[in-house]
Amino acid sequence: MAHPHLLAERISRLSSALEKGLYERSHAIRLCLLAALSGESVFLLGPPGIAKSLIARRLKFAFQRARAFEYLMTRFSTPEEVFGPLSIQALKDEGRYERLTTGYLPEAEIVFLDEIWKAGPAILNTLLTAINERHFRNGAFEEKIPMRLLVAASNELPEADSSLEALYDRMLIRLWLDKVQDKANFRSMLISQQDESDNPVPASLQVSDEEYQQWQKDIGAISLPDPVFELIFTLRQQLDNLPNAPYVSDRRWKKAIRLLQASAFFSGRDAVAPIDLILLKDCLWYDAQSLNLMQQQLEILMTGHAWQQQAMLTRLGGIVQRRLQLQQQQSDKTAFTVIKEGGMFSRRPHYTLPPEASASTLTLLLQKPLKLHDMEVIHITFDRSALELWLTKGGEIRGKLNGIGFAQTLNMEVDNAQHLVVRDISLQGTRLALPGTAEDSMPAEIKQQLETLENDWRQQHTRFSEQQHCLFIHSDWLGRIEASLQDVGEQIRQAKQC
């Protein structure tokens, strides 16, 4: 088997070749290629004339010697037009009921059925068996069919509670397509002279029969790690609890997981990663309402849980709360405390300085820096006599901010715990402390917890960076996930700086 990274590069180049000349259909081509490489079915929903049939025809060129069959269903379509006519010779000579299948669906690797919901019951029943079991009953014999990809298309969804639901459930990937939107792409499409029947894929990129068969075994060997399973189960529970969520059968979940395994395999990985789960948005919807719902639920999962974003924010909230508790305890211990004086009948309490504040000039540290008089202040120098007078009689108090310049007026008070508190213009306050008693505002316990959390964040970001090279995921999703991780990282960095 080729080296995983070489295989991923080859599949990427194969997809690029298939996409040539198709405008705004890259994502559809890539998912149809993934379906073809893993033996699944695709439903394309969209108005006529938007290259649905061309997508299916292109996929034939992904394989060496692949045969294609396409048919436009009508209400009058017969099984003979899809599965082949009856052999008159066999019926006449041997009395055998046998179809001549050469050139029809039973012998094609790539099948495209347009206006699929117009098919009658006889076609639908045979088609269900072909999709489920990859077998076709031809008279008295069961014949194995080589179908690797079935692309069904329509401009409408099947009616609810109709006989078509069983077939619709077999369409694992469901893509809602629209007209070309971008102006430049529309112009390029109009003037393109490319022959749609030309093979755009170099022979060196085409998949051989042996490779295809081996890859089916290799896909099954891709592991589903426990954390990824937990994300899938969380999504399943969310859908079960939402009133308007689509019903998703166990069979559909199982087939979807195999698609995720294929995504991991063709991305060069040996295990399903959270990034692969984005593919579920194209597997689990039923109609327009459930399509939007799936987008919302996958976005919540990818930007909140897949790389532990919400869990890390919850941990950060707990660390910040603990830091506030420790800082409050430390603040009570180190704050500069004055002595309350005065009798019980005094109109106003007055205070005196403690014995350790005996110098003629006192420098007190702010336990938290404040912006005072347009200056970032970390300590204030007071004249001892002026401070004593203010403690005794009140009035105006001045101090030199950071010990420089002229003394500036201060908004200062004594709190209930007899600590000096200075406030800024927005009335945010901090206690004052003597030099040598104010300790680091960030306790060692908190520093360690923040370091551990930041390391965990780096690991998650590295995991995402290693996993994001997935051909089958649109780049818009990668941008949203990256933004969610960067937001968590920024909040951690801000907490470390406080």
UniProtKB/Swiss-Prot annotation:
<feature type="binding site">
    <location>
        <position position="49"/>
    </location>
    <ligand>
        <name>ADP</name>
    </ligand>
</feature>
<keyword id="KW-0067">ATP-binding</keyword>
<dbReference type="Pfam" id="PF12592">
    <property type="entry name" value="ATPase_RavA_C"/>
</dbReference>
<keyword id="KW-0143">Chaperone</keyword>
<dbReference type="InterPro" id="IPR022547">
    <property type="entry name" value="ATPase_RavA_C"/>
</dbReference>
<dbReference type="InterPro" id="IPR050513">
    <property type="entry name" value="RavA_ATPases"/>
</dbReference>
<dbReference type="Pfam" id="PF20265">
    <property type="entry name" value="LARA_dom"/>
</dbReference>
<feature type="binding site">
    <location>
        <position position="53"/>
    </location>
    <ligand>
        <name>ADP</name>
    </ligand>
</feature>
<protein>
    <recommendedName>
        <fullName>Regulatory ATPase RavA</fullName>
        <ecNumber>3.6.1.-</ecNumber>
    </recommendedName>
</protein>
<dbReference type="GO" id="GO:0016887">
    <property type="term" value="F:ATP hydrolysis activity"/>
</dbReference>
<keyword id="KW-0963">Cytoplasm</keyword>
<feature type="binding site">
    <location>
        <position position="196"/>
    </location>
    <ligand>
        <name>ADP</name>
    </ligand>
</feature>
<feature type="binding site">
    <location>
        <position position="51"/>
    </location>
    <ligand>
        <name>ADP</name>
    </ligand>
</feature>
<dbReference type="Pfam" id="PF17868">
    <property type="entry name" value="AAA_lid_8"/>
</dbReference>
<dbReference type="GO" id="GO:0005737">
    <property type="term" value="C:cytoplasm"/>
</dbReference>
<dbReference type="InterPro" id="IPR046932">
    <property type="entry name" value="RavA_LARA_sf"/>
</dbReference>
<comment type="subunit">
    <text>Homohexamer. Interacts with ViaA.</text>
</comment>
<dbReference type="InterPro" id="IPR027417">
    <property type="entry name" value="P-loop_NTPase"/>
</dbReference>
<dbReference type="InterPro" id="IPR003593">
    <property type="entry name" value="AAA+_ATPase"/>
</dbReference>
<comment type="function">
    <text>Component of the RavA-ViaA chaperone complex, which may act on the membrane to optimize the function of some of the respiratory chains. RavA functions as an ATPase.</text>
</comment>
<comment type="similarity">
    <text>Belongs to the RavA family.</text>
</comment>
<feature type="binding site">
    <location>
        <position position="23"/>
    </location>
    <ligand>
        <name>ADP</name>
    </ligand>
</feature>
<dbReference type="GO" id="GO:0005524">
    <property type="term" value="F:ATP binding"/>
</dbReference>
<dbReference type="InterPro" id="IPR041538">
    <property type="entry name" value="RavA-like_AAA_lid"/>
</dbReference>
<dbReference type="InterPro" id="IPR046898">
    <property type="entry name" value="RavA_LARA_dom"/>
</dbReference>
<keyword id="KW-0378">Hydrolase</keyword>
<feature type="binding site">
    <location>
        <position position="50"/>
    </location>
    <ligand>
        <name>ADP</name>
    </ligand>
</feature>
<dbReference type="Pfam" id="PF20030">
    <property type="entry name" value="bpMoxR"/>
</dbReference>
<feature type="binding site">
    <location>
        <position position="52"/>
    </location>
    <ligand>
        <name>ADP</name>
    </ligand>
</feature>
<feature type="binding site">
    <location>
        <position position="54"/>
    </location>
    <ligand>
        <name>ADP</name>
    </ligand>
</feature>
<keyword id="KW-0547">Nucleotide-binding</keyword>
<dbReference type="InterPro" id="IPR023671">
    <property type="entry name" value="ATPase_RavA"/>
</dbReference>
<dbReference type="InterPro" id="IPR045427">
    <property type="entry name" value="MoxR"/>
</dbReference>
